[in-house]
Regions:
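N-terminal secretory signal peptides
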Residues: 1-13, 21-22, 29
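Conserved redox-cofactor binding core of oxidoreductases
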Residues: 53, 161-262, 282-283
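Beta1/beta-strand and adjacent pyrophosphate-binding region of the FAD-binding site
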Residues: 76-90
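Conserved N-terminal glycine-rich FAD pyrophosphate-binding loop of Rossmann-like flavoproteins
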Residues: 113-135
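Glycine-rich active-site loop/strand segments that organize a redox cofactor
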Residues: 127-159
Length: 406
């Protein structure tokens, strides 16, 4: 999966590396991610739970409990040996497990839930042999810039070089197994994704698993079946609890809780962590993303398990300023049309309606607002909006009823 001699990731290996962290070399090192669990944290000196600081609503007093490693689990009821152990049956973990299996590895895939889980509908990558290398390089620099120069350029380059092949591989596998997926090519890409700093010529493969309510989650259930038929051993309802390290300090396995007690999965070649985010761990979320304290959560049971295990094994979660991922307006398909925007709580206009959609949440972080606002427009919008050339995407009243039935 990872070429330790060359220090590079192969294109097929990218499918495994995409799972967030490959923790089989010299121990886990760094992990970028999100965070949330109980209120307050533990003081690193006393071990007691520290209360909220009360300063600007931040929970930053003492060492958070999720960073404190628990006692090692020693009551092991069963030990199993594999080449590769993947934790998390999602859109990263399942392709990683299947790819490793096809490469000849004996693979175990551990999943906390009773089925595969994944969200969203699309994934994109650049078709490198049909794209302008200068445009690809410009896009890589743009992504670093748009991330306030906090992104890892090397990680972005992995996506630039390998993303297209990886997405196409998944798309083809799901389609061949009967999943509902198509390639939308460049249709979902904005102008900024196709023409960067004057450089043109980017071509994308864009998988779309849909239409809704069908999603990536349904596609991953199909791919999980493909993986099982290929020889991957999938352990559902088997949450990973701790990573195991060998005498040299390298991660060499995973301890998970099975139906009859704790199981140790030894991994001769490596462990891949693909456990998703931490939006449902309140302590982690309030620690790393205090802006989201009053926002609702779209998902459930996403408690940063992989982040914690990697930290307990000696790794590091990326510093604060994690992405909020507040980019989904399922109930408002014309979010990018500058209709009057008012707060739900007060009915008052609160912003310049040309603000980028992903930034709107920054105006709505209070307990009263909790991320809620309304767009106001009348029935004449069907005649007016099409005349606003270059502004938003027009949606007919008939199509709007699909989202907001009377």
């Amino acid at each position: 999966m990872f070429d330790a001699k060359q220090g590079s990731v192969s294109r097929r290996g990218f499918l495994g590396f995409a799972g967030v962290a490959a923790a089989g070399l010299a121990g886990a090192t760094a992990l970028s991610g999100c965070s949330p669990r109980t209120s307050g944290g533990k003081d690193s000196k006393s071990g007691e739970v520290a209360g909220i600081s009360g300063v600007s609503g931040h929970e930053r007093e003492g060492l958070p409990s999720f960073l404190i490693a628990p006692e090692p689990i020693t009551d092991i009821s069963e030990t199993l040996d594999y080449d590769v152990v993947v934790v998390g049956a999602d859109s990263a973990g399942i392709p990683a497990a299947l790819s490793a299996c096809e490469a000849g590895a004996k693979v175990a895939l551990l999943q906390k839930e009773s089925t595969a889980i994944s969200q969203g509908n699309t994934a994109s990558g650049i078709i490198t042999d049909k794209s302008n290398p200068a445009a690809a390089a410009a896009l890589a620099q743009l992504l670093v810039k748009e991330s306030a120069y906090r992104a890892d350029p090397a990680l972005i380059q992995v996506w630039i070089d390998n993303g297209g092949e990886a997405v196409k591989w998944v798309l083809d596998k799901v389609a061949a197994a009967g999943g509902s997926v198509i390639d939308q090519g460049n249709n979902q890409q904005s102008k900024a994704s196709n023409e960067v700093n004057g450089y043109e010529g980017l071509n994308y493969v864009t998988s779309y698993m849909g239409p809704k309510p069908y999603s990536n989650g349904d596609g991953m259930k199909v791919l999980a079946q493909v993986a099982e038929e290929a020889g991957v051993d999938i352990y559902y309802s088997t949450p990973a609890e701790q990573l195991v390290k060998n005498e040299d300090g390298a991660v060499s396995g995973v301890i998970a809780e099975g139906e009859n007690g704790y199981m140790q999965f030894n991994a001769a070649k490596g462990v891949i962590i693909a456990t998703g985010d931490y939006q449902n761990d309140e302590e982690m979320s309030n620690y790393y993303l205090p802006d989201l304290r009053y926002f609702g959560r779209k998902q459930s049971n996403k408690t940063g398990d992989g982040h914690k295990m990697i930290v307990w094994a000696g790794g590091k979660i990326t510093n604060i300023v994690h992405t909020k991922m507040m980019h989904d307006f399922d109930a408002g398909p014309m979010w990018n049309v500058p209709f009057l925007a008012v707060k739900t709580a007060s009915g008052k206009r609160f912003m310049n309606e040309k603000i980028d959609m992903a930034m709107v949440c920054n105006y709505l972080t209070s307990e009263a607002d909790a991320g809620r606002y309304c767009q106001v427009f009348d029935s004449k919008y069907e005649q007016i909006v099409p005349e606003w050339k270059g502004v938003g995407k027009f949606v007919s009243a008939e199509d709007m009823r699909v989202y907001m039935p009377e």
